[in-house]
């Protein structure tokens, strides 16, 4: 790996404990509260990771919008969300389900369970939200929408010293032309 490839990377370590969580109201969506997971600072603004909780699910919708970004990933931790996405129609994500929403894809979250929680990761950290699709989108890596529903059969057992782990690949490598690779990792037994 070249020196330039390593020197322009952020190298800070970040962690955030739920017990010590600081939640914020961003004002844009009063029915959500947000917890910064420290990735923005650690990555020098290249990425953002947030834990988002629904605090009021009464007839709340986000309205049609899209985002000017390079990557958006949502992983449902608890509850469910219903949304409509351009080119996909109606989608419901439940605990363990996830989606990659490409840049400038119009979508509207239309319903949330009262206990809805999601982890959202974006690249870059600063994202512009638009209520209309722009006529000129600039250059973006080829990207397609992926919706991945939790299926225990989709996990693959690790090999060698990691044989106590199982991996579930989301298919984002192909969907983002190699920009992002993402997996869920879980134990399949004792870790000794």
Regions found by a protein language model. Name each.
Residues 87-104:
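Short acidic-glycine-tyrosine-enriched beta hairpin
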Residues 1-56, 128-191:
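A short, N-terminal "cap"/entry segment at the start of jelly-roll beta-barrel domains
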Residues 117-129:
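Short, structured interface segments
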Residues 26, 60-68, 85, 110-111, ...:
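Short histidine-centered beta-strand/loop micro-motifs
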Residues 51-55, 66-83, 121-124, 184-188:
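Short, conserved beta-strand element in jelly-roll/cupin
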Residues 36, 85, 101-102, 109:
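Catalytic cores of nucleotide-enabled group-transfer and carboxylate-activating enzymes in metabolic
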């Amino acid at each position: 790996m070249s020196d330039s490839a390593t020197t322009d990377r952020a190298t800070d370590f970040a962690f955030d404990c739920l017990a010590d969580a600081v939640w914020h109201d961003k004002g844009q969506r009063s029915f959500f509260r947000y917890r910064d997971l420290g990735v923005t600072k650690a990555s020098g603004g290249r990425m953002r990771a947030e834990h988002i909780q629904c605090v009021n699910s009464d007839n709340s919708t986000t309205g049609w919008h899209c985002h000017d970004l390079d990557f958006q990933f949502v992983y449902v931790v608890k509850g469910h969300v219903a949304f409509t996405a351009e080119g996909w129609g109606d989608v419901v994500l439940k605990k363990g389900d996830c989606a990659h929403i490409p840049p400038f894809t119009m979508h509207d979250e239309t319903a949330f369970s009262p206990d809805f929680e999601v982890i959202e990761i974006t690249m870059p950290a600063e994202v512009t939200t638009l209520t209309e699709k722009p006529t000129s989108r600039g250059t973006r890596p080829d990207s397609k929408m992926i919706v991945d529903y939790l299926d225990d059969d989709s996990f693959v057992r690790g090999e060698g010293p990691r044989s106590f782990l199982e991996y579930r690949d989301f298919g984002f490598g192909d969907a983002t032309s190699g920009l992002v690779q993402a997996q869920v990792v879980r134990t399949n037994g004792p870790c000794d």
